[in-house]
């Protein structure tokens, strides 16, 4: 991911004739992209979204060279990043690594379109908890004919995509992916009733896990 900001130059031959280019992770399920990435957004911003799992750049010689031409302003220098054997998360904010391209662009006064459109799922929880969004109870996703929605007890919110990083998920084999399906924290199915069953099993699992923790402390 550290080389992603340089893709505009690295793959310039492939980008001839295109107005924009981008990068994303492979553990995503996409919804209706153009509902969120409108013509107005594309023409107003040189970069759309600031996270590594989903970013779009204007395809111009100026923007494609940002990674090496913008002053680092105390953040990570691209030459050091490209020579490092460690992951520097250079394609995003990377505050824990010293600052990446998103931070560098901000410090240079380049505005990034960064509305919360995607469901970036927190890796530290078994249940779905979305970074930069409120906590929802019994959260799952519904995909239907090209649209992806976040669903909870009294909530329905369409999202650009959902990011299922570092998560093992069982998939029902009899799913019509072009029509509709549902995604629970560890299960994908075309039957909505199975989602309710999953939440009951999940609550039981959480109770058992809590009891084990209590027992280990008592001992």
Briefly describe each language-model feature range.
Residues 197-219:
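Alpha-helical membrane-targeting segments
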Residues 1-16:
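Active-site-proximal specificity loops/subdomain of glycosyltransferases
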Residues 17-31:
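Short beta-strand-to-loop acidic/aromatic patch adjacent to the donor-nucleotide binding site
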């Amino acid at each position: 991911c550290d080389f992603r900001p340089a893709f505009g130059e690295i793959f310039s031959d492939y980008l001839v004739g295109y107005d924009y280019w981008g990068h994303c992770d492979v553990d995503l399920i996409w919804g209706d992209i153009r509902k969120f990435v409108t013509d107005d957004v594309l023409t107003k911003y040189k970069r759309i979204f600031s996270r590594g799992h989903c970013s779009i750049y204007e395809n111009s010689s100026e923007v494609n060279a940002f990674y090496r031409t913008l002053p680092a302003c105390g953040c990570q220098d691209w030459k050091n990043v490209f020579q490092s054997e460690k992951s520097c998360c250079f394609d995003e904010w990377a505050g824990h690594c010293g600052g990446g391209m998103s931070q560098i662009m901000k410090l240079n006064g380049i505005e990034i379109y960064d509305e919360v459109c995607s469901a970036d799922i927190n890796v530290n929880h078994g249940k779905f908890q979305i970074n930069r969004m409120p906590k929802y109870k019994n959260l799952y996703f519904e995909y239907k004919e090209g649209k992806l929605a976040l669903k909870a007890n009294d909530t329905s919110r369409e999202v650009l995509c959902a990011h299922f990083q570092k998560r093992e998920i069982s998939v029902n084999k009899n799913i019509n992916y072009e029509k509709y399906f549902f995604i629970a924290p560890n299960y994908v199915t075309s039957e909505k009733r199975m989602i309710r069953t999953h939440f009951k099993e999940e609550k039981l699992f959480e109770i058992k896990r809590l009891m084990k923790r209590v027992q280990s402390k008592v001992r």
